[in-house]
UniProtKB/Swiss-Prot annotation:
The protein's enzyme class: ligase
Binding site for Zn(2+): C333, H384, H510
This protein's encoding gene: thrS
Xref: Pfam families: HGTP_anticodon, TGS, tRNA-synt_2b, tRNA_SAD
Region listing for Catalytic, in residue ranges: 242-533
PROSITE patterns: AA_TRNA_LIGASE_II, TGS
PANTHER family in alphabetical order: THREONINE--TRNA LIGASE, CHLOROPLASTIC_MITOCHONDRIAL 2, THREONINE-TRNA LIGASE
Name by which UniProt lists this protein: Threonine--tRNA ligase
Cofactor: Zn(2+)
A GO MF term: ATP binding
HAMAP family documented for this protein: Thr_tRNA_synth (MF_00184)
Reaction catalyzed: tRNA(Thr) + L-threonine + ATP = L-threonyl-tRNA(Thr) + AMP + diphosphate + H(+)
Amino acid sequence: MPDIKLPDGSIRSYEQAVTVAEVAASIGAGLARAALAGKIGGQLVDTSYLIEQNADLAIITERDAEGLELIRHSTAHLLAYAVKELFPEAQVTIGPVIENGFYYDFAYKRPFTPEDLVAIEKRMAELAKKDIPVSREVWARDDAVKFFLDLGEKYKAELIGAIPADQQVSLYREGDFIDLCRGPHVPTTAKLKVFKLMKVAGAYWRGDHRNEQLQRIYGTAWAKKEDLDAYLHMLEEAEKRDHRRLGKQYDLFHMQDEAPGLVFWHPKGWAIWQEIEGYMRAVYRNNGYQEVRCPQILDKSLWEKSGHWEHYKDNMFTTSSENRDYAVKPMNCPGHVQVFNAGLRSYRELPLRYGEFGSCHRNEPAGALHGLMRVRGFVQDDGHIFCTEDQIESEVTAFNALVKKVYADFGFNDVAVKLALRPDSRVGADDVWDRAEDALRQGLRASGLEWTELPGEGAFYGPKIEFHIRDAIGRSWQCGTMQVDFSMPGRLGAEYVGADDTRKVPVMLHRAILGSLERFIGILIENFAGALPLWLAPVQVVVLNISEKQADYAAEVAQKLHSAGFRAEADLRNEKITYKIREHSLNRLPYQLVVGDKEKADGLVAVRTRGGQDLGQMPVDVLIKRLQEEVVARSGTA
């Protein structure tokens, strides 16, 4: 006779074992209709799950975050069901949930077309409308392998074959379609009402370019139609803001086939870069960091000692010379340990903070490259703090405050914090990971921050705090990180002399605020739709003469602004002033200064803001003071 405790603290008693669906029905007909799954002891289960003992139970509906993930997961299966009905020869592989949706990979003899996607989506809607029950079945592993091989589903059979033979596997059936899955799933296809297929892209089996190429169909699914509409509107807005298009339009950078994943910065784009690097260099200096510079290429043996070779070699570029093997650095941390090791260190020097604008290279798959957002060569505002274990909390707390300040200066005030915990592939003993994870939690508590935890998402050498900024159209971008590492310093021989005159191994904190500068610039371009705030704008002020008679004065004003430290240009073309104003307005320049005969005679400029506001005439010195105040405040221009 199980007693079921509900989230409101009430307890319901039942005379016999009861399913999650039956509990929901006993509470109310509305909840029974809305139930998608249950949550028992923190674990999600199907509504058909039989509760035989006392338990704490929450009924999951579309209002819960877990409910939306269930909808997306189940819609991925619905997609596979529809594809198999329309294209029986297609083989199914995997179909996980991703941010804002899902995808499913298929092996098929020809590319899926846009017309195919329309047909597949239509069939999905038909299957959903049929209200087909979704049920869980438990099979012996070998029986499941044989079943899928008999169906000609070699990929699914391979996945199941990798499971230990003595383990059972769970399969989910809906109508004539059956798929491998841990679950849970929605109880019926009728729960899947709001979805849209987005695109087809290439993928490789198991993510390895040496394997067969597959076709990946992406989709999105939501609980309500208005949520889908809002998401599609956001995508339209994101397309308008695409940094690749704006980068070309505003002459900031380009990329080309001869250097995949590498950036050619144009003068205007490099001006943005230099401004950001200068700002972050001041952040280093003002917060006790010593800037260092380490080699691009290091002997393979060092990467073996650090653990990178074992856990990261597939993402590393390598080269050989004079019978020695080298790797181009994908990360800066081993180099910073070498700087630490170059002298005898004392506990009195700790915490010792190193910062570097470290140029790194990672061999990302060609299909994953995406403008500035995913590159093969990038620079990080990277830093490493060598400290004692009892200094971790204060260092993490100080860093958390610094991150908040930096993001605010760039216009990002909505920051979510996540704690990524130990992955399956890692270095170090579990007790070391326990200490590292607890140290980060303590630092977050001391900062008064709320966070969510991400099991299995940490780096191979340590857990990490992730800082996710939200942009102007609601997208979340993970930028900053703080990681505690008890392993790498010892692996690379880092030591200091403690207060008791014994040699001790320091703790190493890996930290970055912006992350990849390339990616952060891409985020900035899209966040501001190219209209960067004054302090970041590649051209801050343009001076426009009305006629040839004011050309010398316009050039003089531009030079005065330039001498005051501003990125200023003079547009002296023999064009109508309305044409020049319109052109520079389209280029989203923060300020336009118009000079005619009156302005020249009185030593003034007529000032227009990016938003079209007319600030009237003013002396150049007054304008310079205004601009200086705006730059110091890091505020945007209307």
